[in-house]
Amino acid sequence: MPQQFEQPQAQQAVTQEDDALATTQAATQTESTDQADVLDDILDDIESTLETNAEEYVNSFVQKGGE
């Protein structure tokens, strides 16, 4: 009889672990999506800067007179 009571508890523990894992995976996926959105925004800003003023942008990185 005691073994019959242990199985549901073990199954319940596994279910709770599965739920915790699923929650963690969902949070990680959401964070990855947020980071991708931020990166896309940064790349869009760079692209628009290059489209409107590429020469000035490049010149800001070029050293002059051996500096």
Swiss-Prot record:
Keyword terms: Isopeptide bond, Ubl conjugation pathway
Annotated region (ARC ATPase binding), positions in chain: 23-61
Region ranges (Disordered): 1-38
Keyword match Metal-binding: no
Skewed-composition ranges (Low complexity): 1-36
GO biological process: modification-dependent protein catabolic process; proteasomal protein catabolic process; protein pupylation
One Pfam match: Pup
Cross-link (Isoglutamyl lysine isopeptide (Glu-Lys) (interchain with K-? in acceptor proteins)): 67
Origin: domain of life: Bacteria
Transmembrane segments: none
Keyword RNA-binding belongs to the record: no
GO molecular function: proteasome binding; protein tag activity
Pathway: Protein degradation; proteasomal Pup-dependent pathway
Biological role stated in the UniProt entry: Protein modifier that is covalently attached to lysine residues of substrate proteins, thereby targeting them for proteasomal degradation. The tagging system is termed pupylation.
Record-stated family: Belongs to the prokaryotic ubiquitin-like protein family.
Entry note about domains: The N-terminal unstructured half of Pup provides a signal required to initiate unfolding and degradation by the proteasome but is not needed for pupylation, while the C-terminal helical half of Pup interacts with ARC to target proteins to the proteasome.
Record note on quaternary structure: Strongly interacts with the proteasome-associated ATPase ARC through a hydrophobic interface; the interacting region of Pup lies in its C-terminal half. There is one Pup binding site per ARC hexamer ring.
Name assigned to this protein: Prokaryotic ubiquitin-like protein Pup
